[in-house]
Amino acid sequence: MPGGCSRGPAAGDGRLRLARLALVLLGWVSSSSSTSSASSSSSSAPFLASAASAQPPLPDQCPALCECSEAARTVKCVNRNLTEVPTDLPLYVRNLFLTGNQLAVLPAGAFARRPPLAELAALNLSGSRLDEVRGGAFEHLPSLRQLDLSHNPLAYLSPFAFSGSNASISAPSPLVELILNHIVPPDDKRQNRSFEGMVAAALVAGRALQGLHLLELASNHFLYLPRDVLAQLPSLRYLDLSNNSLVSLTYVSFRNLTHLESLHLEDNALKVLHNGTLAELQGLPHVRVFLDNNPWVCDCHMADMVTWLKQTGVVQGKDRLTCAFPEKMRNRVLLELNSADLDCDPILPPSLQTSYVFLGIVLALIGAIFLLVLYLNRKGIKKWMHNIRDACRDHMEGYHYRYEINADPRLTNLSSNSDV
């Protein structure tokens, strides 16, 4: 058995050497794999860093000269003398105030951004000295509900200002409230066009404002309302026309404003409301009309309106309405008037009026000719006046002389003896 004993130790040594070799190989593989993984990770790190740096920052920055509140979704750029709309508005903005600036012109796409300001719902541009609003100025604002352009002297308001640059293909405006108080420009900037007509064209173009609920047009010196100014506003509920210079509502129609709830006509120059207007107002199911501080003329033309006022519940504060003219009716309450109080001065027939006008012209012409003749003969007239004055003086001196003789008896006797 010695041979067996000799093979045992040799076999054990061989197995030990194999085990050591396996451990060496395993250590080399692990080290090489760790080295390669480390090198690969280190080589990929610059790529990840560059990719991270290539991504644009989140668009939540606040424009210079503005105040931002992400919690309130509000940006205020107030009284900063801005000459254009900031281009770096945050995407979260829902309420944007750009009041008290120097914008002058609002061009097409003034608020167009990529991505768009999809959350912007209320835009206030009042008092920013805007004198021109071009077509498509408010495009790409899909959520805009309230727009305030008050206190801007708008010499030019494009017909497509609210409907887009091409009204024939543009979608309806999302506007619900439009505030245009005191936008009348100075007389020297009206560019030979009717201000009332310009505003009306912007309201009806493309039927873009059919969803409008509130429209304020106060303090614009309107003398009249164009015939179709309200024709494309069927959803209107609140209409403010106060503090203008409206003399009559004869040409405008309220018939299609079936949802109208408040109509403000205070502080105008209305003298009377005629039957057509009265019937239209009475036909609106929910309306309340405010007519205070108008110079009502209480003559025979007021009879129908007085009767209507006594019967209707449409007019708010109707007991405060008083007469302004004629003088004898001043401060009389309209509801207290009777038909006998409302009379008119007799009107001359048109032919007789024409005759009187012609007679006045003839008399004025004769008077002008007479004055011209006097002026041309002023020297002769002056000489004639002097001659008359001298003749009168001689006559008066002779009269006084005879009076003195007759008044003295001695001179009278002497005169008699002289005659004898």
Swiss-Prot record:
An example Gene Ontology cellular component term from the record? plasma membrane
| Cystine residue pairs | 62-68, 66-77, 298-323, 300-344
Signal peptide limits: 1-34
Residue ranges annotated for the LRRCT domain, each copy included: 283-346
Q: Which residues cross the membrane?
A: 356-376
Query: Which regions of this chain are Cytoplasmic-facing, per the record's topological domains?
Result: 377-420
Residues bearing PTM Phosphoserine: 418
Q: Which SUPFAM superfamilies does this one have?
A: L domain-like
Q: Which UniProt keywords apply?
A: Cell membrane, Disulfide bond, Glycoprotein, Leucine-rich repeat, Membrane, Phosphoprotein, Repeat, Signal, Transmembrane, Transmembrane helix
InterPro entries named among the record's database cross-references: Cys-rich_flank_reg_C (IPR000483), Leu-rich_rpt (IPR001611), Leu-rich_rpt_typical-subtyp (IPR003591), LRR_dom_sf (IPR032675), LRRNT (IPR000372), Wnt_signaling_inhibitor (IPR052286)
Q: Which residues form a coiled coil?
A: none
Q: Which residues lie on this side of the membrane: Extracellular?
A: 35-355
Pinpoint the residue ranges of every LRR repeat in the record. 92-113, 116-139, 141-163, 172-204, 209-232, 233-255, 256-275
Instruction: Consult the record and explain the modifications the protein receives after translation.
Output: Highly glycosylated.
The entry annotates sugar attachment on 81, 124, 275
A single GO BP: negative regulation of canonical Wnt signaling pathway
Gene3D superfamilies (UniProt xref) = Ribonuclease Inhibitor
* This protein's domain notes: The C-terminus of LRR N-terminal cap (LRRNT) and LRR 1 are essential for the inhibition of the Wnt signaling pathway.
Q: What does this protein do?
A: May function as an inhibitor of Wnt/beta-catenin signaling by indirectly interacting with LRP6 and blocking Wnt3a-dependent LRP6 internalization.
Q: What is this protein called?
A: Trophoblast glycoprotein
State the species of origin.
Answer: Macaca fascicularis (Crab-eating macaque)
Tell me the classification of the organism that encodes this protein: Eukaryota, Metazoa, Chordata, Craniata, Vertebrata
Gene (UniProt): TPBG
